[in-house]
Amino acid sequence: MQHARKKFRVGRTSAHNRCMLANMLKSLIHQERIETTLPKAKELRRCADKMITLAKKNTLAARRLAVARLMVRYNKLTSKEARQAKAGDLSVYNVDRKVINKLFDELGTRFVSRQGGYTRILKLQNRVGDNARKCIIEFLAN
């Protein structure tokens, strides 16, 4: 029996779920507002609240833990990114670093006085193709 054991299940493998949540969390931190389906947003809210709590501590250990949870890759580039870097576009190296800096410098300081509930989920109309429940997840203004 699985009493009180919440698992995020959307019909994917656990590695795919981890990577998908890390990518969605990076997008949420970078843009502060994304549109997704309701089950993904509910799981993303749990992860985002934990990351903001880490960012409020603003220690080296918290930064390292955030880098690990966001699966930040500083030296691993895809073949497309390697071609861009060879061509002189060095912005491919800075995307994840910007996300970490924004998390700790902007979002961590914005929510210092707040004890929890850093995100909000706004429900939208269902998607036309498959009738999936759509929503917007965003960080609160303050």
Swiss-Prot record:
GO annotation, cellular component aspect: cytosolic large ribosomal subunit
GO biological process per UniProt: translation
Keyword annotations: Ribonucleoprotein, Ribosomal protein
UniProt entry tagged with the keyword Ribosomal protein: yes
Gene3D superfamilies reported in the protein's UniProt record: Ribosomal protein L17 (3.90.1030.10)
Single GO molecular function: structural constituent of ribosome
Subunit structure: Part of the 50S ribosomal subunit. Contacts protein L32.
NCBIfam families: L17
UniProt similarity note: Belongs to the bacterial ribosomal protein bL17 family.
Name this polypeptide is given: Large ribosomal subunit protein bL17
Originating species: Chlamydia felis (strain Fe/C-56)
Gene name linked to the record: rplQ
